[in-house]
């Protein structure tokens, strides 16, 4: 939480953490731990592309008043180690559309890094209309395309992840600094 307790004269001076260990009625339970106040000359809020504190700060300081609306997507990423014969360090592939249907924005990337590593991923706009669309399954289909599959065959996936991503472009970025902090 950030509030008037740590935001005086429009200057953020830290954060206040929430209490932990309260019951549904608000009563302290065993192991209750009270929140604490963390003061700072400058506070960095790094909670991802659509964090709750970030939304509050953008509204309070009107950080997005000169920005276009932001667009979001779900990004899925994997790291593979592949056979040296299938590796072309420095190769970059970008794709658009397929296997997504008409009207669904998205695409993929495949980067050949050092040490036989390939970073690949697929991003689907969160504005898709098909309620049956599964971004993870679309990523799996994308990896079966002959142009992608040939680099992965016989390789081993060594890492993976997913997260929400901003995809509105530079014109959609809010101002990132405000008195006492930054997003």
What positions do the PLM features span?
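Core beta-strand elements of the Rossmann-like FAD/NAD(P) dinucleotide-binding domain
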Residues: 25-42, 178-181
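FAD/FMN-dependent oxidoreductases across multiple families
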Residues: 104, 130-131, 135-183
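Short helix/loop capping segments that flank catalytic or ligand/cofactor-binding pockets
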Residues: 25-26, 52-55, 119-121, 129-132
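Short, hydrophobic/aromatic-rich segments at coil-to-beta transitions
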Residues: 11-15, 91-93
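Glycine-/small-residue-rich beta->alpha transition segments that form the dinucleotide
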Residues: 21, 40-52, 126, 145-146
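Central beta-strand plus flanking loop segment that forms part of the substrate or channel wall
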Residues: 50, 59-91
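Active-site substrate-recognition segment that forms the wall
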Residues: 95-127, 175-177
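Short, small-residue-biased leader/transition segments that mark boundaries at the very start
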Residues: 1-8
